[in-house]
Amino acid sequence: MSPPTVPPTGVDGVSAYLMKKRHTHKKQRRKPTFLTHRNIVGCRIQHGWKEGNEPVEQWKGTVLEQVSVKPTLYIIKYDGKDSVYGLELHRDKRVLALEILPERVPSPRIDSRLADSLVGKAVGHVFEGEHGKKDEWKGMVLARAPIMDTWFYITYEKDPVLYMYTLLDDYKDGDLRIIPDSNYYFPAAEQEPGEVLDSLVGKQVEHAKDDGSKRTGIFIHQVVAKPSVYFIKFDDDIHIYVYGLVKTP
């Protein structure tokens, strides 16, 4: 898991509240196809990744979503990476030789009632660190992930980015517990009776970092189970950030 990061303290006129948790007969195999601009949601992909002067890495993963308010942006879960990435796969020059793989995404049966019962809940999630030491990270289960049926979107207080884990086994094994007060660090949005809150999805956002520089981004998703919570994609970062937003006077 990535180490905790220091999150922004505010987003464009609203206060931000944090949330955060691996010599025989051979069958002829279909070769990967080089990608054209087709619908790739649900596809398994692979490509090279070249960051600055670093060596090229090979990444392989599943395309989960195409962002409706920014269609060039895709949400991807890469194998071996816990956090979810947002990339403009056809435009980002760091993405090299993008290919579709002939693999299918497995669809195992799960306990849908139990899975749905976890969504929107504040949780304590136990991870095992070095030397077998266990550490509980408090966070919130945001949604069941698309495409990959046994996975969940989740975020943590210690690191307010979007993660994906298969949580049902952890819950059954006692490594995931539900915290009764789901508003303890994600306050509910203040709302007058009958008031309909405007969605921020598609709106641009700007915030000042600690060093005085500014970063810009876009609200890409509103969490159905917690409408005061949004996913934000900043232009200078491939991670998806998660914030609970409340109106300020």
Curated annotation (Swiss-Prot):
Region of interest (Tudor-like domain 3), residue spans: 201-246
Region (Tudor-like domain 2): 119-168
Marked site: Histone H3K4me3 and H3R8me2a binding: 159, 170
One Pfam family per UniProt: Spin-Ssty
Subcellular compartments: Cytoplasm; Nucleus
Keyword vocabulary terms for this entry: Cytoplasm, Nucleus
Annotated segments matching region Histone H3K4me3 and H3R8me2a binding: 80-85, 128, 237-239
GO BP annotations listed: gamete generation; negative regulation of cell population proliferation; positive regulation of canonical Wnt signaling pathway
Region feature (Tudor-like domain 1): 41-90
Nucleus listed as a keyword: yes
A cellular-component GO term for this protein: nucleus
One function term, GO molecular function aspect: histone H3K4me3 reader activity
Biological function: Binds to acetylated and methylated histones, including H3K4me3 and H4K20me3, probably acting as a histone reader that recognizes chromatin marks to mediate downstream cellular effects. Promotes canonical WNT signaling, and is involved in the down-regulation of cell proliferation.
Family of this protein: Belongs to the SPIN/STSY family.
Protein name: Spindlin-4
Organism for this UniProt entry: Mus musculus (Mouse)
Chain's gene name: Spin4
